[in-house]
Amino acid sequence: MSKSENLYSAARELIPGGVNSPVRAFTGVGGTPLFIEKADGAYLYDVDGKAYIDYVGSWGPMVLGHNHPAIRNAVIEAAERGLSFGAPTEMEVKMAQLVTELVPTMDMVRMVNSGTEATMSAIRLARGFTGRDKIIKFEGCYHGHADCLLVKAGSGALTLGQPNSPGVPADFAKHTLTCTYNDLASVRAAFEQYPQEIACIIVEPVAGNMNCVPPLPEFLPGLRALCDEFGALLIIDEVMTGFRVALAGAQDYYGVVPDLTCLGKIIGGGMPVGAFGGRRDVMDALAPTGPVYQAGTLSGNPIAMAAGFACLNEVAQPGVHETLDELTTRLAEGLREAAEEAGIPLVVNHVGGMFGIFFTDAESVTCYQDVMACDVERFKRFFHMMLDEGVYLAPSAFEAGFMSVAHSMEDINNTIDAARRVFAKL
């Protein structure tokens, strides 16, 4: 047995499923998950000594690559002054200034510890601000594991085949209206059925939890218009897309102005950080200035803030997003060409530093129904064969891939060459 197999066997006796987040268990692809010893740049190294070109990037945060010296040094320096104080710090102020400068639609920001906390808190705030209970989300989109959001959810919930999680009371779920991504008619129908009851729409501007599904040109502006028409707030969940699709996020890339924005992943540089913010009048409704309660023992802790501040300063440097786009475009084009040479039907979506691989005869993948029609069994075989080639992709047909600026063009070309060999045998 390999060391990963031994560790996984021991872990399953102590941790549910042997992992602390379901998708890591390789449930979506089968087999034994890799246990990682270390990571550096674009590479992961497992406990058995094998190296992999990494396109998971800790599920998105590692846009600069693993073990970036600026982030590592910032964490070490902050840790020497103490780990957590439960009191305000200067770094919290500096971090808030930087985030609101980089994302101009955020007049104010509140730091939390995860993307789930950010979306959960933003929805509570929207409900409190509007005095309404119902929310709209989209089929296949995932916004964390808060009860009201595990309704027709994406990400690990799709991988497990459970879009509706047990343990979510029907009384909670009844306030969540689920519409079809990229289908404005379904959203208008929901508003017309409940014209005075919907507090907000929450949307991934690029649906990255049913793999990678970009919005159609009219979709996000249409959501903005419907929110304005019916008096609801628009929450853009940029936990995955923030600072990755563009410096100011997908909202800037697609030219749409939300009322609230949720952030995570890159904002922490690898540490557990989330944030939500937006219009000043809405944020003023949040405690302690307003009646909507939200709190967190470790929110804004100095280690996480130092990591996030260092990361965002690096991400804001000229050329970062151009490099991400160039590398991702080359990978997407190369995978398409290699699949076509082998006669394998493949769609590769990509936006900025995100991409998605779909085995399908369809010409495009634009919604949940398109994703569910893809050949998951073929993806499973592709995943394991690429793993044997030293390429680590997301272990699920329903998860996006992530590029970093630490990837070289040689890494990309080696990945395409590996895919060409795999497609020939697939």
Curated annotation (Swiss-Prot):
Single GO molecular function: pyridoxal phosphate binding
Record PTM N6-(pyridoxal phosphate)lysine, positions in chain: K265
Subcellular location: Cytoplasm
GO cellular component: cytoplasm
Primary localisation category: cytoplasm
Pathway assigned to this chain's UniProt record: Porphyrin-containing compound metabolism; protoporphyrin-IX biosynthesis; 5-aminolevulinate from L-glutamyl-tRNA(Glu): step 2/2
SUPFAM superfamilies: PLP-dependent transferases
Reactions catalysed, as given in the entry: (S)-4-amino-5-oxopentanoate = 5-aminolevulinate
Presence of keyword Isomerase: yes
Example of a GO biological process term: protoporphyrinogen IX biosynthetic process
Keyword list, A-Z: Cytoplasm, Isomerase, Porphyrin biosynthesis, Pyridoxal phosphate
InterPro entries per record: 4pyrrol_synth_GluAld_NH2Trfase, Aminotrans_3, Aminotrans_3_PPA_site, PyrdxlP-dep_Trfase, PyrdxlP-dep_Trfase_major, PyrdxlP-dep_Trfase_small
Cofactor(s) listed: pyridoxal 5'-phosphate
Name this polypeptide is given: Glutamate-1-semialdehyde 2,1-aminomutase
Protein family: Belongs to the class-III pyridoxal-phosphate-dependent aminotransferase family. HemL subfamily.
Keyword Cell division: no
Top-level taxon: Bacteria
EC number: 5.4.3.8
Subunit note: Homodimer.
UniProt enzyme class: isomerase
